[in-house]
Amino acid sequence: MPKPYSVKLQYLVPKIALTALAGKLAHLRAGWLTTTVIRWFAKHYRVNMLEAVNPDITSYASFNDFFTRALKPGARPLADAAQLCPVDGAISQFGRIDKDQIFQAKGHHYSTTALLAGNAQMAREYENGYFATIYLSPRDYHRIHMPCDGKLLSMTYVPGDLFSVNPLTAEHVPGLFARNERVVCEFANSEGKFALVLVGATIVGSMATVWHGIVNPPRRGEIQTWHYHDQDIRLKQGEEMGRFLLGSTVVVLYPETAQLRFQPGWHPLRAVSLGEAMAQ
């Protein structure tokens, strides 16, 4: 299938430089100009500011402050389910992992080993397991929360490209989520291990976690791993674990032993909300 022009263009533009510039601009505190940009963005993308702890657009000093805004308590009630949806967004794909192959879009798969930065040992944990890929659009709430209780085991920063991660790009860029910059966070609980993979994209200025702070920038040229086995970092189901600046994607991985049953109403492109039931 021929690639659309908008996808072809992504191969040509300097995505990393463009993203670095966007990140700097998003940190600017430019008074009325910042407010004007935020007001346009909120209107253009129909952002529901009534859900925010601070609904006053004029009070945000920078675009990043606005974009990582907190929600009011109770804005996303937690369902009674084993696994909760970790973000607001839209379902890209979900289901079983076929040995080590994760379904991206029609005609495209990628391996768990590639997604996990070549860590074959970690990838074996998820052979024939389960995955869910959720796309966050610019209008969505951009903090990521825990789908279940978990003790942090490790975090790995993986350098990569910065293609857009919207559905159109996912259909036309092979191995998209395994080639973009990403942060792999692995956890464990009484049921076994699971992983949350935060995938970067064009204009996504940075990714951060609650235990580390901003992971990128700086954008390192090599894989870097932090181990937390000797630290008792535990997060409860529904608790914040990280955040994006601008839209991106989260991939959740579970082992075969999880024996998950995804919600009957789940299907690709369906809008989902943080805290709703994802699987039993």
From Swiss-Prot:
Single GO MF descriptor: phosphatidylserine decarboxylase activity
Positions of modified residues (Pyruvic acid (Ser)): S248
Protein's cellular compartments: Cell membrane
Family matches, as InterPro entries: PS_Dcarbxylase, PSD-B, PSD_type1_pro
Entry cofactors: pyruvate
One GO cellular component, as annotated: plasma membrane
PTM comment text: Is synthesized initially as an inactive proenzyme. Formation of the active enzyme involves a self-maturation process in which the active site pyruvoyl group is generated from an internal serine residue via an autocatalytic post-translational modification. Two non-identical subunits are generated from the proenzyme in this reaction, and the pyruvate is formed at the N-terminus of the alpha chain, which is derived from the carboxyl end of the proenzyme.
Disulphide linkage map: none
Gene Ontology biological process terms from the UniProt entry: phosphatidylethanolamine biosynthetic process
UniProt keyword list: Cell membrane, Decarboxylase, Lipid biosynthesis, Lipid metabolism, Lyase, Membrane, Phospholipid biosynthesis, Phospholipid metabolism, Pyruvate, Zymogen
Name of one Pfam family that matches: PS_Dcarbxylase
Major site of localization recorded for this protein: membrane
Active site location: D88, H145, S248
Reaction equation(s) it catalyzes: a 1,2-diacyl-sn-glycero-3-phospho-L-serine + H(+) = a 1,2-diacyl-sn-glycero-3-phosphoethanolamine + CO2
Site (Cleavage (non-hydrolytic)): G247, S248
Bilayer topology annotation: Peripheral membrane protein
UniProt-listed Enzyme Commission number(s): 4.1.1.65
Free-text cofactor note: Binds 1 pyruvoyl group covalently per subunit.
HAMAP family recorded: PS_decarb_PSD_B_type1
Subunit structure: Heterodimer of a large membrane-associated beta subunit and a small pyruvoyl-containing alpha subunit.
General function of this protein: Catalyzes the formation of phosphatidylethanolamine (PtdEtn) from phosphatidylserine (PtdSer).
Protein's name according to its UniProt entry: Phosphatidylserine decarboxylase proenzyme
Protein source organism: Methylobacillus flagellatus (strain ATCC 51484 / DSM 6875 / VKM B-1610 / KT)
